[in-house]
């Protein structure tokens, strides 16, 4: 140890000895540890601009492996001091002031301007029975400036850009992407590292995150000085966003759904005939057939494999589809031929793959034998369909093996990972007691899309470097940008008020540091315009939505019947 380091440690020891309230403070290589309010607390610099605060109840300190944060603490020069009863830690970017008696933590910029306060006595651990495992409800309160504007919280359908003065229940569902992350106009962000359903509350008294289950209070303070700096910090902490291939960033045609290879290819033909630019087309659901065969990850619908009339395959005909409907003699007779035809037309193709499986599928049987099915009601209801457990690495292996063998090896370009919340029908509280590889579903619920996208991205990257990964998915969580994941705002309706809400939703989502997002142009459900597509108001709505769509990373038309 050199003399300079020895002097610093001696000075620190003198501070502790002189200050009774700091006697339980221990210096670490990047911060401090101390006990306060019946908790063990760690304050650690991950970089000059990122600080992690980690609190555990009781006398035993434990750590956790984050699903979101991939950055390891970097060597950061930190100076230590004291200010009355408080201990101070300073990097070249920020200063942190800790009161070991009250548990309060204050964050300042290098000029001494207060940025955020972790409130005195603001951490609460309430014992909670997590499906038989002793745990806690965890609540953490902060103090913001009265007129401070904050963004983030994922993609919400409130129409609010400023996320102050409201209460939100953060549990991923269709149209609502829930990320416990706030981005302040003052040039900092706060990420609450908890994956369970969480209530965000902001009122004149405090701003808080209240999570249903957790073993710790764990958050990251990220200072950037401005929005670009904050986003750079978020990606340093949780992963960079890969650059997509150019063909992804254009116009995509999609609908619910194309019912045969011929229909899909004829749409591509029409765009080329009209000389309207088209970069890609998307095959939606039921290429696998009926609901019992849901998401088999195989082309088993007889219309896709030229097997109409064959008893072996007619059982897979989609529910409600007329087996006697005459589509004529098929021009495109196989999935491989369909994909090749799209490529010959200088376009790309994406396909829908879901996070659940029907009871007839080989995938259902494999996941069930692995105990990797989540047994609650999902879409489509009353068909025996169950979501899989993406937290289980073996389940992610099985998932990709089927995608590769049955679809990717045919030449498929991109993936539409639908229903990655996942869809949850007839919700019951006990559903969240369902066990996953990482504990109760309640404990890890909001990280479902992160883990599902992780599996596909990492496996495709391991399979080949010749084709960049492109994932379109309906749900998301912080860190998902590192998996080449692009989200859209779900099954929104064709209304001016709904279009307006997407503006706020997309801006707040992007300010979480995740750049790739779009919305269904014109709305997915037409609702009051059903059977009235010639309505001039409907036309005007589409025109305006398409004009906005030009400026979204992906311009995608996707509508239901």
Predicted features by range, described:
Residues 24, 40-42, 79, 95-97, ...:
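Short, surface-exposed charged micro-motifs
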Residues 266-286:
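Catalytic domains of carbohydrate-active enzymes, especially glycoside hydrolases
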Residues 82-248, 254-257, 261-263, 268-273:
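Catalytic and substrate-binding clefts that recognize carbohydrates or anionic sugar/phosphate headgroups
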Residues 280-561:
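Aromatic- and carboxylate-enriched substrate-binding clefts and catalytic-loop regions
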Residues 45, 55, 91, 98-100, ...:
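Glycine-rich, histidine-containing beta strand-loop boundary motifs that form or position
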Residues 23-37:
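Short N-terminal segments immediately surrounding and downstream of signal-peptide cleavage
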Residues 25, 29, 44-87, 125-128:
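A low-complexity, Ser/Thr/Gly/Pro-enriched, surface-exposed linker/loop concept
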Residues 1-24:
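Bacterial Sec-dependent N-terminal signal peptides
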